[in-house]
Swiss-Prot record:
Source organism of this protein record: Gorilla gorilla gorilla
Residues annotated for substrate binding in this entry: 35, 38, 69-73, 94, 113
Entry's Gene Ontology molecular function annotations: lyase activity; nucleic acid binding; ribonuclease A activity; RNA nuclease activity
Cleaved signal peptide residues: 1-28
Name of this protein: Ribonuclease pancreatic
GO cellular component terms, A-Z: extracellular region
EC number of this enzyme: 4.6.1.18
Catalytic activity: an [RNA] containing cytidine + H2O = an [RNA]-3'-cytidine-3'-phosphate + a 5'-hydroxy-ribonucleotide-3'-[RNA]; an [RNA] containing uridine + H2O = an [RNA]-3'-uridine-3'-phosphate + a 5'-hydroxy-ribonucleotide-3'-[RNA]
Length: 156
């Protein structure tokens, strides 16, 4: 009788441990979609020629911790509009992958580039407001942006 219970409980215990081992590392870990939003979305503001915009935003969004992120782009459009890019013109990503999409229309963005000579922990950025098409990599269910690949000028 005790052996029968052990034979039933052992696989159940193994299954529970496997599930916990699989779920635990993802607890508290930022998803790729959330990371994209943190690093690239700034729907609440319009592009700013304020020279301190990038310095403030890069710090605020935790992109200057441990190192200075060399380049970053903020998109100043509603999140739903950026998510809809995942269903627009399919293009090849810079890395050769086939999950990138180009926006049908220009979007308001701000490019942030590390200035020459800037070193961690004193990360200093050049702020460049622009209006360009964006290219994002999408994945998941729901299918959403997970990587900002590039911005391109209107070809018309």
């Amino acid at each position: 009788m005790a052996l029968e219970k052990s034979l039933v409980l052992l696989p159940l215990l193994v299954l529970i441990l496997l599930v916990l081992g699989w779920v635990q590392p993802s607890l508290g870990k930022e998803s790729r979609a959330k990371k994209f939003q943190r690093q690239h979305m700034d729907s609440d503001s319009s592009p700013s020629s304020n020279s301190t915009y990038c310095n403030q935003m890069m710090r605020r969004r935790n992109m200057t911790q441990g190192r200075c992120k060399p380049v970053n782009t903020f998109v100043h459009e509603p999140l739903v509009d950026v998510q809809n890019v995942c269903f627009q013109e399919k293009v090849t990503c810079k890395n050769g992958q086939g999950n990138c999409y180009k926006s049908n229309s220009s979007m308001h963005i701000t490019d942030c580039r590390l200035t020459n000579g800037s070193r961690y922990p004193n990360c200093a950025y050049r702020t460049s407001p622009k209006e360009r098409h964006i290219i994002v990599a999408c994945e998941g269910n729901p299918y959403v942006p997970v990587h900002f690949d590039a911005s391109v000028e209107d070809s018309t």
